[in-house]
Swiss-Prot record:
Keywords: Amidation, Disulfide bond, Knottin, Secreted, Signal, Toxin. GO terms for cellular component: extracellular region. PROSITE patterns: SPIDER_CSTX. Disulfide bonds join 51-66, 58-75, 65-88, 77-86, 115-130, 122-139, 129-158, 141-156. Residues 21-47 form a propeptide. It holds the Pfam family Toxin_35. This is DELTA-miturgitoxin-Cp2a. Belongs to the spider toxin CSTX family. Double-CSTX subfamily.
Length: 179
């Protein structure tokens, strides 16, 4: 039963991703690729131009919408009278999640304004692991026994707990299914 449910959801996800691109999206991408000013547009983006605010027009730069509290806004287009108009909007599910969660709480600053990266030694700074995704990594220590002299040594590293990894994967999958 679990496998049939899993494969059913997987089938629906693949079907959704296959049907999500319309012919209009494909022609817009082909037109953009064939434009003469393609290189100049890339150079302009690389200069670090500002993002487009919510409810402002994004017809010329569909990937330049600003980020909300947590999620990035999407450029939604509406064709009216032969002319297309695009506006940066926040997805409904993102609005609900952001209103429920509120502002992202700031984490306390670790020692020396630096945190211990993933898989690095955290034996001396067990509470200073970096943040990975939504959650902060945890310092996990293991007792290692040396084969040659039989001594036990403690090996510590910043790792992501399985529960956190599963929650992040589920949220990513849900976001992919909805949006």
């Amino acid at each position: 039963m679990k496998f049939s449910l899993f494969f059913g959801v997987l089938f629906l996800a693949i079907l959704h991703s296959c049907l999500s691109e319309s012919e209009k999206d494909l022609t817009d991408e082909d037109h953009f690729r064939s434009s003469d000013s393609f290189l100049s547009e890339i150079q302009e983006e690389s200069r670090g131009k500002k993002c487009i605010e919510r409810n402002k027009e994004c017809t010329n730069d569909r990937h330049g919408c600003c980020r909300g509290k947590i999620f990035k806004d999407k450029c939604e287009c509406v064709g009216s009278g032969g002319k297309e108009r695009c506006v940066c909007k926040q997805k409904k599910w993102a609005k609900i999640i952001e209103s429920y969660i509120g502002d992202i709480p700031t984490l306390p600053k670790p020692e020396d304004d630096k945190c211990v990266p993933k898989h690095e030694d955290c034996s001396e700074r067990k509470n200073d692991c970096c943040k990975s995704g939504l959650f902060t990594l945890k310092c996990k220590c293991y007792d290692m026994q040396d084969d040659e002299d039989g001594k036990k040594t403690e090996l510590c590293g910043c790792v992501q707990p399985f529960e956190h990894k599963a929650i992040e994967q589920a949220l990513r999958f849900g976001k992919w299914m909805v949006g």
